[in-house]
């Protein structure tokens, strides 16, 4: 009985090694019959990428295609795909960013981040105009609307070198977004 107990662990190791290899020499490699249940992974859906808006549409909207930036400092944030452009020279007075993510309009109804919500019409869409809490309403504005399962947000940030902009930021943003309307998801 003692002798059998000594060999049981050795036999178990041999059986495991034999089941993991399809060849007699070399390193053990697991084959399909020994791996048990197959693991399936599904990647999370990815929001529509606003950087795919054609350059011609960006130019028609008054933005500079040469200033396109994917993400914020190159990174998407909080599940949103992000793309931004400066206004066209010589003014280069503001920066527009488009954010797309799997959220609802409730996202901008968060009083800890956004305020001054009001309904607006932007192009063919019913939207919600908003301000970020820390933003100067004389220089910045945001607008949001839903397209299918995605929330599309756009923001305008006026450059700090522009003291008193010759435009209303919300009116300017709505004009830019309306010009891009046909390129955005529906």
Regions found by a protein language model. Give the residues of each.
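Residue-level signal for functionally critical sites in structured catalytic/ligand-binding pockets
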Residues: 2, 20, 144-146
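C-terminal motif of bacterial Sec signal peptides marking the signal peptidase cleavage site
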Residues: 15-19
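A small/polar (G/S/T-enriched), proline-flanked helix-loop surface module common
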Residues: 24-186
